[in-house]
């Protein structure tokens, strides 16, 4: 039985002062079978560690550089993230692919180094509106998955997380329908099966991301291949994020 994962990606939001206010109003009632994760900016990780260390909530990072140390100005290593208590690291988010030009090869290195350091990569995949219109969704997503998993042992693939985030839905307010999201997530599971076998496909958790909120989370989680959500804007207010978590546990 795959555990539901409700993950918040704060992106470049929340100063330390704003994060402190968030956590002071963040009162989680743990629900069985549902895991909560918060991925704040790097600057908020020490504070996040302080507030969440004695709770069931996990925390992670939005990025990593795939080297141990060195002359990589402005970057952060997997060991540094591990030292701050991170359990997860987001890899391959479309904003980093598009704005910062991260390649499939570079993302694969991140996925590999995160796994090697005992953390769980959340691999983001998704298609543009044009690719969707042209019927290229499966081609794009299969390519991203195969590239990202090249350095991962087949026996370890099932412990990863893949987040399907259609680029056209991120921050737009227009989520994919639950049925459309399920069709793509089912394809992702089949792709994982082709790469790493039936057990990996059965074990791997697949999230949907893109304008998820408390009003639609239950619809997504009714689908058999959707195991949670990667949430942006709705994770920035404790009452909104907690509402999503509550509905995920029903």
Cite the ranges covered by each PLM segment:
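Active-site loop-to-helix "anion-binding N-cap" substructures in soluble metabolic enzymes
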Residues: 1-250
